[in-house]
Amino acid sequence: MGLFGFGKKEKDKMKDGLEKTRTGFWGNILNTLTGSKIDDDLYDELEEQLILADVGGEVAIKLVDKLRDRVNEKGLKTGEQAADELRELIADEMRPEAEMQLDGHPAVILVIGVNGVGKTTSIAKLADYYTRQGRRVMLAAGDTFRAAASEQLEIWADRAGVPLVKAGEGADPAAVIFDTVKSATARGYDMVIADTAGRLHNKANLMGELAKISRSVKKAAPDASLETLLVLDAITGQNAISQAKEFCKAASATGIILTKLDGTAKGGCVVAVKQRLSLPVRFIGVGEGIDDLIPFTPEGFVEELIPRTGWKH
């Protein structure tokens, strides 16, 4: 493992996946700062560019206010110096308060999110990632309300080379996940990744269903650890944040998977997610391949998004 906690392959994937974002609106932010004198007009323009990059108005104002304070405290004079400070500030704002808890027996990851955001493929990509990390992974087809969900997940499980536990349409999701955790424990698997229903038409039902699943996990394996990752589509930008806020009213997520980051020239919602939802981004999707889901690190993200190379101080 190399820089920022991941290897060259992951670093290259992040670099390639952020190409549109780096050369798009974030490129405009750098152009705004580079060669500029630090004054109120610059701060106003930077705030506007951050909003255009999908950071959102509230977060953009907060970032610029903090940048202004840091610039004044350190006596910085040039836009290039301010850009370096912005890099550090963004990394600080996105840093998680704790690592994922995956030391249970088994470690269980529930994956939640509305249909169409890349939830099923993210599950398979998680399975592939953790398998490559040496974990023995089993999948649970917990979305029993959508006819094609289990079949789709089965195809991806085959690609990832991991076993899948499923039941018929309309089966109790908590029972499916209970059986999976029991099976994993009996067969020596140390991780279960579970799909859940991708709908949000009734918050009370969803909340009750996820609470029941959580109880079933602990009943099946008292020593299990439990993480709940919410999948969001980066292309939808601020709409993803609004959608996530609604989902989080019904579900206690512990982290975010941000998919399709390679498909947007904005990408500012990565920053907004942590600020608006108080949830860390754990993984980002930077392509369609099964190995194109990579662990997110603020330092790695900022390094590729706002490179220092070639700047004069």
Q: Model-found features: residue ranges?
A:
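Primarily NTPase-proximal linker/entry elements flanking Walker-type ATP/GTP-binding cores
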Residues: K15-D16, K20-T144, A149-A194
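Switch/coupling subdomain of P-loop NTPase systems
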Residues: G2, K9-K13
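Short, low-complexity, intrinsically disordered N-terminal peptides in bacterial proteins
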Residues: M1-G2, H313
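Conserved catalytic-core segment of NTP-binding enzymes
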Residues: Q152, D172-R187, H201-K312
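Compositionally biased, low-structure terminal segments
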Residues: G5-G7, W26, V302
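Short glycine-rich anion-binding loops that position phosphate/pyrophosphate groups of nucleotides
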Residues: A197-R199
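C-terminal effector/interaction modules appended to NTPase cores
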Residues: G2-L3, L76
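Surface-exposed, interaction-prone regions with an acidic/low-complexity signature
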Residues: F4, G17, A251
